[in-house]
């Protein structure tokens, strides 16, 4: 993924339609919000991680990741005490349009930990879509993301923490050869990758398939 890194300067997001992917995980763990846009066949990406502030040094030691450095680099936000403060994440998402000059088309989320936040965004007037965390749903955006990266059709501002997430990520195949990032089998934190895949899924539905959101609930 490093080959897709924008070494100097910023991505100009002004006027773009964007899609937000949210992985809130557990409140004691890392969370991530990722914004993507699809422009002339290229996926633009802006990731941000969130961690519990009081666990910053503990996580840095156990994960061998210098979170204080990444906080200074504005690649990570420390909030809350020993659990992530979801209110900080909710407010960040609701300020994206003003901060970047974009139009949020849809916000994708995993229902396990984000139902309350999604309801708040919906009440604030945003479109929100639950993205099922199942291989049959995640295979297509995972495949598209991989292809965009390999073809250098993916662009993000230099972000070492984001790259570490990719190094940690391990893909698994189900019995139907559907590939997805498996958190349990990954070597470390992959929340920013998962949030990217959620955002790409939403983007794919609107920009590429344009057939409406169609997904099923896994009951077993």
Residue ranges and their predicted role:
Residues 142-151:
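Short, surface-exposed amphipathic charged segments that create phosphate/polyanion-binding patches used
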């Amino acid at each position: 993924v490093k080959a897709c890194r924008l070494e100097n300067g910023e991505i100009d997001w002004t006027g773009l339609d964007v899609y937000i992917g949210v992985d809130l995980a557990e409140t004691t763990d890392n969370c991530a919000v990722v914004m993507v846009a699809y422009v002339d066949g290229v996926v633009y990406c802006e990731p941000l991680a969130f961690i519990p502030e009081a666990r910053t040094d503990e996580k840095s030691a156990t994960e061998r990741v210098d979170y204080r450095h990444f906080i200074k680099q504005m690649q990570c936000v420390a909030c809350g005490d020993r659990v992530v403060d979801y209110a900080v994440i909710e407010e960040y998402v609701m300020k994206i349009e003003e901060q970047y000059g974009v139009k949020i088309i849809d916000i994708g989320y995993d229902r396990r930990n984000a139902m309350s936040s999604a309801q708040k965004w919906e009440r604030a007037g945003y479109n929100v879509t639950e993205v099922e965390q199942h291989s049959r749903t995640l295979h297509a955006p995972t495949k598209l993301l991989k292809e965009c990266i390999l073809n250098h059709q993916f662009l993000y501002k230099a972000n070492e923490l984001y790259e570490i997430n990719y190094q940690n990520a391990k893909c698994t195949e189900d019995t139907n050869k559907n590939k997805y990032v498996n958190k349990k089998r990954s070597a470390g934190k992959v929340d920013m990758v998962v949030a990217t895949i959620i955002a790409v899924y939403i983007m794919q539905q609107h920009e590429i398939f344009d057939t409406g959101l169609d997904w099923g609930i896994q009951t077993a």
